[in-house]
Amino acid sequence: MLDKKKLDVYGPKNNINGINKIVSELNHFNIIGINFEVIEMPGHTLDHIGFYSFNDGSPILFCGDTLFAGGCGRIFEGTYEQMHRALNKISKLPKNTKIYCGHEYTLSNLKFAIEVEPNNEKLKDEYVNVQRLLSFDKPSLPSTLEKELNINPFLRCHIPSVQNKINEKFNTIGDEIEIFTALRKWKDSF
């Protein structure tokens, strides 16, 4: 497709086939009248980036495999600390930000999240809602940052119910990065 049409393909400085517009943190670009800002989000991979737009008061974030509805990406090249920092960066965006992630893993992520926070009513309600949507072949995405802050355990490592569950399961007490690391490793084997 790139051979036939002149398309701009934005991406990090890496040897990724097809990228012809290299961007990094705080770079801006415009596509079809929408201004985007680049946010570096290492963790899943070392050069992972996202595209954020305030979009006239209706903010959107394309975050690839950093944040998923109800979960987050695996750590392939980066570190747990980098991923935790990237998720914290996302959590500071406006609460009405629509989250467009790279995959529809919502239902399995919510099953895990319920294991972590079985008494989280908003989480249980979202699980039922996603089951219903998927039963009608409807996507559960995009999510919103406000929703994720209420249901996503990877954005809730500072919440006592998440900390207590990790401490109970792994007999450890740690800071948020240690909680996040234990949580991500648990999800890897869930």
Predicted regions located by residue number:
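Active-site HxH/HxHxD metal-binding segment of metal-dependent hydrolases
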Residues: 1-37, 59, 125, 129
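Short N-terminal secondary-structure initiator segments
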Residues: 2-3, 11-12, 83, 99-101, ...
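Prokaryotic Sec-type signal peptides and long signal-anchor helices
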Residues: 4-5, 66-69, 158, 184
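Homeobox/homeodomain signature
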Residues: 8-13, 19, 35, 57-58, ...
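Residues at the C-termini of beta-strands that transition into short coil/loop
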Residues: 13, 42, 149
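Catalytic core of the metallo-beta-lactamase
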Residues: 20-117, 176, 187
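Accessory terminal helices/loops
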Residues: 88-98, 107-190
